[in-house]
């Protein structure tokens, strides 16, 4: 069985784990930069190694019988270029969002990316939007294959929309600017008087936690608003199941940072929760407006408020959205199908079928 070195930022229970450890027909080494990035002990095993402890890439590759390198961010692809040069192994690089922008990047990042495009064999952006971005930067189109992040459909079974009387709006994501939580809170404030029983729950932690709490006070959202900033990933399906509407108000951050396609959108669609999201980055690749959800302009409080009001008043449409959304996820975002596609890309690169 061919073995792949996967370099990731850290070891934690993200959506990257299946793309590292569950690719059919391929064994793995889970490489992180150094032990301090080993943050989730249950995921620690004998296949977790540290880049800082590899002094001779050639000896390491020969000892471990490695066939392929896979960096799970462009920045990590740059880190693996010297490794690739010494070992002559093919290099695959995933492109996930910020790495296809100049947001908070070091001086010379674009020059580094052009070198990566020249020397790397294969690039796997997580959506067509990012594929287009890196092509504009100079990545040859024949080196690009879109690989969507998949959803474990067993973990997120279809339940259908909640058609009872509750009006719970839920948003899940790190508390960073590009998630657009502040826009959602302002939109929710605009409709609150018309829907006194409606609630808004934001689930996630991050650098803007203090700002989000302050904004909730400023908007006088009171008990209609909850921020759950310390939630284990294992509890997310249960909390998502309490939603009547899932909202992903993503936007382009002031520093240029963008999304790919938020995994939480895929998870909500899989379970049959009506989804309201912005026309941002790769999101239109999973949601067709008025078919399997609703799309609004990004960073537009009034448009989002109108859409929230429409959704809350249109429960008769929810089941249609939910059924279409589940079909979309099953067809294009099933984790098992995407892992098979990843294996196919590896096979092609290594000269297989």
What are these regions (language model features)?
Residues 104-107, 135, 141, 151-166:
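Acidic anion/phosphate-binding donor-loop and adjacent secondary structure
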Residues 129, 150:
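Carbohydrate-associated surface elements
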Residues 241-256, 273:
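Acidic donor-binding loop of glycosyltransferase active sites
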Residues 213-234:
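Nucleotide-activated donor-binding/catalytic signature segment of Leloir-type glycosyltransferases, i.e.
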Residues 14-18, 167, 171-193, 207-213, ...:
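A conserved mid-protein helix/loop that constitutes part of the nucleotide-sugar donor-binding site
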Residues 289-290, 294-301, 310-316:
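Conserved acidic donor-binding segment of nucleotide-sugar-dependent glycosyltransferases
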Residues 265, 270, 274-277, 287:
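Short hydrophobic beta-strand element within catalytic cores of glycosyltransferases
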């Amino acid at each position: 069985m061919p073995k792949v070195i996967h370099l990731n930022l850290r070891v934690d229970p993200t959506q990257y784990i299946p793309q590292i450890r569950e690719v059919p027909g391929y064994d793995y080494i889970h490489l992180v930069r150094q032990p301090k990035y080993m943050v989730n002990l249950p995921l620690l095993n004998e296949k977790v190694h540290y880049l800082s402890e590899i002094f001779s890439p050639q000896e390491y590759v020969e000892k471990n019988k490695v066939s392929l390198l896979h960096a799970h961010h462009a920045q990590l692809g740059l880190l693996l270029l010297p490794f690739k040069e010494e070992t002559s192994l093919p290099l695959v690089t995933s492109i996930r969002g910020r790495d296809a922008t100049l947001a908070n990047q070091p001086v010379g990042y674009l020059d580094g990316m052009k070198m990566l495009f020249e020397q790397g064999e294969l690039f796997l952006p997580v959506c067509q939007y990012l594929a287009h971005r890196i092509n504009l930067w100079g990545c040859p189109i024949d080196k690009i294959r879109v690989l969507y992040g998949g959803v474990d459909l067993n973990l997120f079974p279809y339940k259908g929309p909640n058609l009872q009387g509750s009006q719970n709006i839920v948003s899940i994501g790190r508390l960073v600017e590009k998630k657009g939580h502040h826009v959602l809170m302002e939109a929710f404030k605009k409709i609150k008087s018309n829907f006194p029983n409606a609630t808004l729950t934001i689930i996630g932690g991050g650098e803007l936690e203090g700002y989000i709490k302050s904004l909730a006070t400023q908007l006088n959202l009171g008990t209609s608003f909850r921020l759950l900033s310390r939630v284990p990933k294992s509890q997310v399906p249960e909390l998502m199941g309490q939603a009547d509407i899932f909202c992903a108000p993503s936007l382009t951050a002031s520093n240029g940072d963008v999304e790919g396609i938020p995994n939480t959108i895929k998870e909500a669609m899989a379970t049959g929760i009506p989804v309201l999201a912005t026309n941002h980055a790769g999101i239109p690749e999973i949601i067709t407006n008025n078919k399997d959800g609703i799309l609004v302009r990004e960073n537009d409080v009034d448009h989002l408020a109108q859409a929230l009001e429409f959704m809350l008043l249109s429960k008769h449409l929810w089941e249609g959205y939910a059924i279409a959304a589940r079909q979309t996820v099953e067809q294009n975002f099933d984790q098992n199908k995407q892992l098979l596609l990843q294996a196919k890309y590896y096979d092609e690169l290594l000269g297989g079928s």
